[in-house]
Amino acid sequence: MAELATIARPYAEALFRVAEGGDISAWSTLVQELAQVAQLPEVLSVASSPKVSRTQVAELLLAALKSPLASGAQAKNFVQMLVDNHRIALSPEIAVQFEALKNAREGAADVQIVSAFPLEGAQLAELVTSLERKFKRKLKPAVEVDSSLIGGVRVTVGDEVLDTSVRARLAGMQAALTA
């Protein structure tokens, strides 16, 4: 995966510089849409077909996007460049890199919250608020339920993990007893 990230980074950075001149959120939406469309097996099949010109592939991709930016010259140039350089399959990684740049600019971060039980609105808001104080930045939560945690939560922000689950505590106790 590191290779894909390395190849995708310059594309994401270049697109981010373009997006800084306009609406970064709108560009983020466009990149996310492109990533979803580019993952479709049918699209990858058409993109790799020698019977379809690169211009036709770019037009197909742009037609599949709902974002109003898709009709702009900059978006067309970006998609055409990806098609010409056979980098359509990198679109999901480009989207990840673009989102990371956007978060860095906003002083925010994505947070993965795995809970043993579903979190309700007030609980989630309180948890996110306390995590924002701890990590000292704005957090964008993605919540997942995993009953194997038994209780508590496991929080991942970037490469930092905060595991307060019962399962983690039991594993720690087991390690201490067997050492």
UniProtKB/Swiss-Prot annotation:
Membrane topology summary: Peripheral membrane protein
A Pfam family matched in the record: OSCP
Residues annotated as transmembrane: none
Organism: Burkholderia mallei (strain SAVP1)
Family from the record: Belongs to the ATPase delta chain family.
Main location: membrane
Listed HAMAP family: ATP_synth_delta_bact
GO cellular component, as recorded: plasma membrane; proton-transporting ATP synthase complex
Subunit structure: F-type ATPases have 2 components, F(1) - the catalytic core - and F(0) - the membrane proton channel. F(1) has five subunits: alpha(3), beta(3), gamma(1), delta(1), epsilon(1). F(0) has three main subunits: a(1), b(2) and c(10-14). The alpha and beta chains form an alternating ring which encloses part of the gamma chain. F(1) is attached to F(0) by a central stalk formed by the gamma and epsilon chains, while a peripheral stalk is formed by the delta and b chains.
Function (record text): F(1)F(0) ATP synthase produces ATP from ADP in the presence of a proton or sodium gradient. F-type ATPases consist of two structural domains, F(1) containing the extramembraneous catalytic core and F(0) containing the membrane proton channel, linked together by a central stalk and a peripheral stalk. During catalysis, ATP synthesis in the catalytic domain of F(1) is coupled via a rotary mechanism of the central stalk subunits to proton translocation. This protein is part of the stalk that links CF(0) to CF(1). It either transmits conformational changes from CF(0) to CF(1) or is implicated in proton conduction.
Protein localization: Cell inner membrane
Domain of life: Bacteria
Signal peptide range: none
NCBIfam families: ATP_synt_delta, PRK05758.2-2
Protein name, entry field: ATP synthase subunit delta
Keywords: ATP synthesis, Cell inner membrane, Cell membrane, CF(1), Hydrogen ion transport, Ion transport, Membrane, Transport
GO molecular function: proton-transporting ATP synthase activity, rotational mechanism
